[in-house]
Amino acid sequence: MSGRGKGGKGLGKGGAKRHRKVLRDNIQGITKPAIRRLARRGGVKRISGLIYEETRGVLKIFLENVIRDSVTYTEHARRKTVTAMDVVYALKRQGRTLYGFGG
């Protein structure tokens, strides 16, 4: 284990990922019933048909912002794994304090 640092057996060094699936159009995985359930939890009774695509768009932007900030915290700490605390700090930075995940 000489000169390999924390990795042990040289894990994650060299070589491209062979079977990396291209991620696109995953926002459609947020289904109509899932959006409906979220709206019900928020006290909504009837939902317009145009709401679903709009909700997907807003959710995508929100998640992009949170993930970008979380990854920034991770990179600053020189880690490769995003922790729950990175997400908590990212949400706090955006004015959405989240309790119950440490810190």
UniProtKB/Swiss-Prot annotation:
The modification N-acetylserine is found at S2. GO terms for molecular function: DNA binding; protein heterodimerization activity; structural constituent of chromatin. Residues 17-21 bind DNA. Residues 1-20 are annotated as: Disordered. Residues 1-14 have a biased composition (Gly residues). Keywords: Acetylation, Chromosome, DNA-binding, Nucleosome core, Nucleus. GO terms for cellular component: nucleosome; nucleus. Gene3D superfamilies: Histone, subunit A. The modification N6-acetyllysine is found at K6, K9, K13, K17, K21. Its main location: nucleus. GO terms for biological process: nucleosome assembly. InterPro entries: CENP-T/H4_C (IPR035425), Histone-fold (IPR009072), Histone_H4 (IPR001951), Histone_H4_CS (IPR019809). CDD domains: HFD_H4 (cd22912). It is found in: Nucleus; Chromosome. The keyword Acetylation applies. It comes from the Eukaryota. Core component of nucleosome. Nucleosomes wrap and compact DNA into chromatin, limiting DNA accessibility to the cellular machineries which require DNA as a template. Histones thereby play a central role in transcription regulation, DNA repair, DNA replication and chromosomal stability. DNA accessibility is regulated via a complex set of post-translational modifications of histones, also called histone code, and nucleosome remodeling. Belongs to the histone H4 family. The nucleosome is a histone octamer containing two molecules each of H2A, H2B, H3 and H4 assembled in one H3-H4 heterotetramer and two H2A-H2B heterodimers. The octamer wraps approximately 147 bp of DNA. This is Histone H4. It comes from Solanum lycopersicum (Tomato).
